[in-house]
Amino acid sequence: MKFLLVLVLLVSLQVSACGAAPMNESEFAEWYLSRFFDYQGDRIPMTKTKTNRNLLEEKLQEMQQFFGLEVTGQLDTSTLKIMHTSRCGVPDVQHLRAVPQRSRWMKRYLTYRIYNYTPDMKRADVDYIFQKAFQVWSDVTPLRFRKIHKGEADITILFAFGDHGDFYDFDGKGGTLAHAFYPGPGIQGDAHFDEAETWTKSFQGTNLFLVAVHELGHSLGLRHSNNPKSIMYPTYRYLHPNTFRLSADDIHSIQSLYGAPVKNPSLTNPGSPPSTVCHQSLSFDAVTTVGDKIFFFKDWFFWWRLPGSPATNITSISSMWPTIPSGIQAAYEIGGRNQLFLFKDEKYWLINNLVPEPHYPRSIHSLGFPASVKKIDAAVFDPLRQKVYFFVDKQYWRYDVRQELMDAAYPKLISTHFPGIRPKIDAVLYFKRHYYIFQGAYQLEYDPLLDRVTKTLSSTSWFGC
């Protein structure tokens, strides 16, 4: 979002900014119109007050029409209500010299960097939110985004108070929530978020995901939309992130700049995910918690959901982690460390705070498996014992997380030490002190304290099927 309050900067920069709020509603309205609708009443000589009044009325009408209000040209209650609604700092009508008509990136692969983090949320949550916000746009375009940790990125994300060095000071809690710059070098493309807001991942405070999707839309070249259903609508409104979808208006706008998604040529006819997760014969390749969510891996994609939530989301593995292969065979999370381990054939990957660690993949034999083991069928971390259980054919191994060593006297037979469980195991999930052992279209709830199966369920029961 690039727009300028100082005329000399209009030629070179395109960003949103905010000054101190005036003392009365009339002055505030003039400030709002100059800030967001290119009202330039302060440039009209004092002797031409009639011209000034006419211009102000025209700008009020323009603003009212944009927001779908009754067009009166008067500063009425509904108009003031919109003006006082929290919003994006980018202008709705920009000076013709401030921004080219169509601004876009001229490359498909873009980098982003989170320069600093808000203290309102866990770093892992912020990372995940921006990853998902970028994915919203990559899902409907050929664009691909990669996070970097140092150096200059195409898109830099910054949390800041007040004056933060770009001529567009934040105004404190409420008012403008964030601003961004249209594509280009240097500061162009960057997105700034007002640290005075209380950033959250819920309906309380200001939802970071929703604002991030909006601002990144600007970073990719989108202007504001006057369609209230569009994520590019200027004012903030809460939508549940788990059920959020881009409007047809948003998809049309972004694809007019970049086109539709390009099929991944590395996927050899992978097919489509099942039309419903409730298919009676559906099985999973791996299942694990990831933070407060549960991931269900299948072929080249995975479903994820919050326990207890009715919403189910589906994502390709490559869009989440471009360096991770499809066909994950086993997975587990060490929640206290925010570490996720993914296994395929004789290799495994470490995902730390949702970011793949460098120097991976590594060989599963470095964990202590003999050369005869060529792949892991399933894995699960037991936080009470601080042990990882690896299931391979009819046997299982136990790995000590504290010692980082495979326990002695292993492998052991699954059928002997897990009564009621017969090989082969597809996936194992630890949830609320129980193991959920997936075998084909069914799962067995296993109580490790009682050493017995306590329930038999459909594999898809997690989805309310």
UniProtKB/Swiss-Prot annotation:
Q: Give me the residues of the propeptide, which is removed upon maturation.
A: 22-101
Q: Name one GO biological process term.
A: lung alveolus development
Residues at the active site = E215
Disulfide linkages recorded for this protein, renumbered to the chain, are C278-C465
Enumerate the glycosylated residues: N313
Which Gene3D superfamilies does the annotation name?
Collagenase (Catalytic Domain), Hemopexin-like domain
Q: What is this protein called?
A: Macrophage metalloelastase
The major lineage groups are: Eukaryota, Metazoa, Chordata, Craniata, Vertebrata
Q: What is this protein's gene name?
A: Mmp12
